[in-house]
Amino acid sequence: MKTRVRGLTLLLGSLAVAVCVAADANMGTWKLNEAKSKLNPNGPKNHTVTYAAAGDSVKVTVEGTDSSGKTYRSEWTGKFDGKEYAVTGDAMSDMRSYKRIDDRTLEFTGTKGGKVTITGRVEVSADGKTRTVTATGTDAQGNKGTSTAVYDKQ
């Protein structure tokens, strides 16, 4: 009996986490709308971001082509709790944190070698069809810049 209760409790807890993650406005695949975005001339092309459930965390995968035509892919898995989690494949950051502001808004910070390299805000529209990312950062050459990237839900 105790085993059944524990099993049921674990199952319900897992389902609750899955429902919360699935209900998150950021979840899904987002494609960059270059025409609506204000990006650095050296910014990404053919850029896609996917948010997917990964247990009780979220996995964010970024894929695309840079301005020189080189393809890239980065991954981050963590929680929207303001704590830093490792990033792979990102030239600007090796750690990133996301903090939930409300149901449709996140703030993020990326660091490289312990120094902040990028900060920004992610906002999903009320209808859930558009995602806008405003970011300020410093690249490897020390150049500072601000961008606004608009994404369409796929």
How does the language model describe each region?
Residues 1-12:
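Bacterial N-terminal signal peptides that target proteins for export
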